[in-house]
């Protein structure tokens, strides 16, 4: 069998485009490979945020949405948008899974525990959804309603949780029932890399009421964390309990409703709470028999718990479609973005298609990635170059995590190093592509590293941007890329390069016109 000449899609996570040079790590970095590509190869800018990717207008994109949209080849109305609509039209308040969980607690005089990232970020959750759930639980008659608030500071400014916690306190005060029971930073509660020591911290504060710190109110607890030098993301577990109140923990027979809608960072804490065969850490004697645990969306196919908003069918995604045509494909990324090039790219589907290989390169075990901005890019590149030169694959999808993961630190110098590490990787990968006469498309799922400081807040800009991202065609063939595209147009463009017809389910458009 003759060697295949692959089409390689390189997703440079968090690598946005900005004309503004100030606080722009892409501009500050030494990027000879990228600079040459931008000068000599067909290129354009594409949208990754708002309505272009099925999000509310003006809402920044994120890795889940970006990879889902790329793989689907169409605009996919995201969970955020679906839940917003259900709240506005009232369906949220009659959602059968939420109703069952709340009514069970009421009937059995048990508590309703609401978990989630309390944030305006809109990436993993939105605080308005948590406030709506508090209202729903109390208005249905629940007498014990507790919010376990995970704090953001990553998809929001580093110290922005006070307004969110104050509003939660105000909502409870107005309803006359319930309170915030604990706070903890997302660094602990929403890990996705099997760092179970972190997850245990969040588990313990909710289940055993054990934590290093306590406070009378959530805002007091946050202020104490700031005094200790902790930003929202890193706030240590704090029990919130007034002078005349008992510590509110998750107990046998209680209902737990997890309001995060993005799956990847919700899985570990969910497994710790409900998995009978859990081995991540010793849960001790106190592990509760939760009567009802509700996932707002499906966190994983093997998590057996009711789902309030089940996944919508995304048939004929890129991976499924080319597998059906007998083509071979590879997905490759380091741990932090592996789910994105597999689960999310396949439309929220865990299946591995015929002819689909996967390579997972472990992310480095460091506390934060600014300590190692190159992350595992060299190792990913080693494996990717080998795969390109193997002649086995028709299509290869690769994610480089650096610019997003280091961009979230808000540390400019580290972000510059991340950009430079990706540029070195690009040079090696494109040399391999050229060697086998393959083709490459280079893009990003959203911006981040091109906007590292927020002059409005006076704080580092740790969240994603709403700026466009590059889309570059690298080939021995000549061509032109159309303007005005979005991530929904990436898969149709790859199919055109592979000389494959576009399935009717893909409503994105091919952006490339080949010459000659």
From Swiss-Prot:
Record's keyword annotation contains Protein biosynthesis: no
Please provide the Gene Ontology terms (biological process) for this protein.
glucose catabolic process; glycolytic process
**Zinc among keywords:** no
Q: Where are the catalytic residues?
A: 63 (phosphoserine intermediate)
Q: What is its EC number?
A: 5.4.2.12
**What pathway does the annotation place this protein in?**
Carbohydrate degradation; glycolysis; pyruvate from D-glyceraldehyde 3-phosphate: step 3/5
Binding, Mn(2+) 1:
404, 408, 464
What keywords tag this UniProt record? Answer: Glycolysis, Isomerase, Manganese, Metal-binding
Citing just one GO molecular function, the answer is: phosphoglycerate mutase activity
Q: Which cofactor does it need?
A: Mn(2+)
Name recorded for this polypeptide: 2,3-bisphosphoglycerate-independent phosphoglycerate mutase
- Species of the source: Cellvibrio japonicus (strain Ueda107)
Gene behind the chain? gpmI
